[in-house]
Amino acid sequence: GRVLEVSIGPGVNLPYLVGRADVGEIYGLDISLGQLKRCREYVAHQGWDVQLQLGNAEQLPYQDNTFDGVFHLGGINFFNDKKKAIDEMIRVTKPGRRILICDENEKGAQAYERVIPGFKRIAGKLRPAVVPPTDLLPPEVREVRLFNVWKDWMYCIEFTKA
């Protein structure tokens, strides 16, 4: 099917998609022109067919019910309007299909503050505690699952569009 990665960055997740029998067309969107440039170079070097687009997760430039799967790995904690981004991911997903949203949890954020120079400054000195945004999911989504991955440093919210 047709899959969209929101905030594709340099394309580090693409090797997990390319060549899978259940993945046909791959789309990627990022707000950063620099990240998209790196991703385009990576995709060209690998010889992959990936449709890349500059855009904002809070206003996805795709038609309703376009994708068989949508995922976002990292970044939603810094979005201006998390609810709008989640609503947009739902909007562009076909009914009955899955959406996956992951980002660092509080444990991960604290670890990043210890090991990544400048992370605390980026996140803000008095940043609020990181809480998975399950409260922002609309009531009509189904099969909501919240779990941790990557040494329990990241949360993942997986659900199905009604």
Regions found by a protein language model. Name each.
Residues R2, R97-R98:
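Short glycine-centered segments of the SAM/dcSAM-binding site in methyltransferase folds
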Residues D30-I31, D81, E104:
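Short beta->alpha hinge that forms the Motif I/post-I loop of the SAM-binding pocket
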Residues D68-D81:
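A short SAM/SAH-binding and catalytic strip from SAM-dependent methyltransferases
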Residues K83-P95:
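A short glycine-rich, Lys/Arg-flanked "PGG" loop and its adjoining helix->strand segment in the class I
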Residues R2-Q59:
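Class I SAM-dependent methyltransferase SAM/SAH-binding core
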Residues L100-E158:
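C-terminal alpha-helical "lid/dimerization" subdomain adjacent to the S-adenosyl-L-methionine
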Residues E58-V70:
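A short acidic, Gly/Pro-enriched loop at the edge of an enzyme's catalytic core
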Residues R20-A21, F79, T93:
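A generic alpha-to-beta junction signature in SAM-dependent methyltransferases
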